[in-house]
Amino acid sequence: MFLRTQMEQSQADIFALIKPHFGVMESSASYLPGFFMTFLLLQTTVLTQAMSLDIQINIQVPDTEGVLLECTSGSLIPPAEMTWRDSKGNIIPHSTTFDSQDRAGLLYLKSSILLKNRVQSPITCSIYNVTTNREKKRSVVLPDILFKSEYMSLMSNKFSCPLTYLFIIIFLNCLKGMLDFCCLKGKPVYFRELINKIKEVLNIKMRACCTLIWEFLLIVLYIAFLPFYLKFRSRASILDDAYPLHSNWLWDICIVLSVLMIFFTGLSLFLLWTLNCYGQMSYLPSMSMDLSKHDFEQNSSKSSEFQENYDVSCEIFLGTFEETIFSQHQESCIEDSFNPLQPLRLDCSLNWKT
């Protein structure tokens, strides 16, 4: 009766601890710290299955070899011994055991067993005191999913999965910051030339698609975290009275976060598409005006060059024509001056008049 009262009191304390989260509905942003903290706690260990002031049983999945059960108890009057039994009362040999005494002479016991195959639940940890001839027991029910290979592989990668996820997020943020810095400052030149080559290769549509993919890749990773967490959460069962309430609360929070992320992602895409269309429409008239102005300037420059060439050619032609006439008249004048059949006279008045 005393143990039952203590167990009910511990369950009431757990429910009182999480009850304020169910009564008042706050903004979704305030749940994010608890949301990620719960995930980290579940990554570290599965919460305690059975607790009391005397006996405590913990369930852990250290690797893919099996399920590890730990039973601890303190403040015992020596001598005392701890044993594990299955549902049929058969003794399960323990893997490790540890005992110690404090200054008051009270005994502290700790024992663990490694279950590689599914056993018939419940599993009982009992402590028998030889002096008082009394026995204390605590039982725990193991779900079948704990012995499935999918759950064991997921729990064995409990540190690699979050670290890989965080590494990808940090790498993408750092890469984006470096590219933005290089675009703004123009240094180093290698990155600037690389970006210019990429822009030259890609056309307008492909460039817009790459921009959208780059901007919303992090949002997609954030949204993809929720199904991963829910998949893990559904496998890591917590067998206590507050488990249904806790699971429903997490489901509601995940649904709210998913709806908000999808809504704001769609809104951002729509605004970006609208701005892109407006920018193209405003760019076409300015481009046509620039082209017409450029054609006019080019035609005017060509006409001025043609006029200059025409004037130069006319001047050259007139100059050569005058030189030709002057040379002809000079030759005729020389022939008339040195004709031996005529008297010596010079009559070049016509040449001077011309």
Curated annotation (Swiss-Prot):
Tell me which Pfam families the record gives.
C2-set_3
Where does the signal peptide begin and end? 1-52
Q: What lineage does UniProt assign to this protein's organism?
A: Eukaryota, Metazoa, Chordata, Craniata, Vertebrata
| Record's function text | May act by engaging a cell surface molecule on immature T-cells in the embryonic thymus.
Q: Which GO terms describe its cellular component?
A: membrane
Q: What is this protein called?
A: Selection and upkeep of intraepithelial T-cells protein 10
According to the record, glycans are attached at 129
Superkingdom to which the source organism belongs: Eukaryota
Query: Which stretches are Extracellular in the membrane topology?
Result: 53-158, 231-252
Q: Which InterPro entries match?
A: BTN3A2-like_Ig-C (IPR053896), Ig-like_dom (IPR007110), Ig-like_fold (IPR013783), IgSF_BTN/MOG (IPR050504)
Which compartments does it reside in? Membrane
Please list the residue ranges that the record places on the Cytoplasmic side of the membrane. Answer: 180-209, 274-354
